[in-house]
């Protein structure tokens, strides 16, 4: 009983499933463990590498997503799924975001140390409701999604050598940084162009590093803000 992510992952030259590979069923892996795997791949010195990381990120239970010493926003407990604990839940969730910031910073530092043409593209597949309004929605699987579930980050980083090799990508993404975009529409076209992949499936009008990028109307179906 595997997910599509599992099937796609197993098509890679190298793949690791941290939790599934553990003999301990109660094992709760940290996203930090992915960095060791990245270091291992980078050490191979391959000229071309495409690395995909699927993090736990900010999934509930939030307090399991960051080390206790990284609990910056307090109190972060108890975090039962009840409106009365909303402040604690938000603190714990914000701690996961802060931890993800640290994770991405360390990943970028690892890439910088390679002194090669490198680019990183990061996004989330969903946001989160934490009892934000009178509907008292929680998590992210509502039949009718809210703004909080749809609003996600979309982050691009390029190394200095990448910017020098492909200045048009850096200049274009800088011009496009304040434009509206849909991550589900733009992620893969942007990734393909960053990697210089030529395919009939590539749509540069949806790539934010392309001069051809075109903002398209954002449609919400039965969405109440």
Language-model region placement:
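Short glycine/proline- and charge-enriched loop/turn segments
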Residues: 13-21, 136-141, 168-173
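Metal-dependent active-site segment of extracytoplasmic phospho-/sulfohydrolases and closely related
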Residues: 96-139, 188, 192
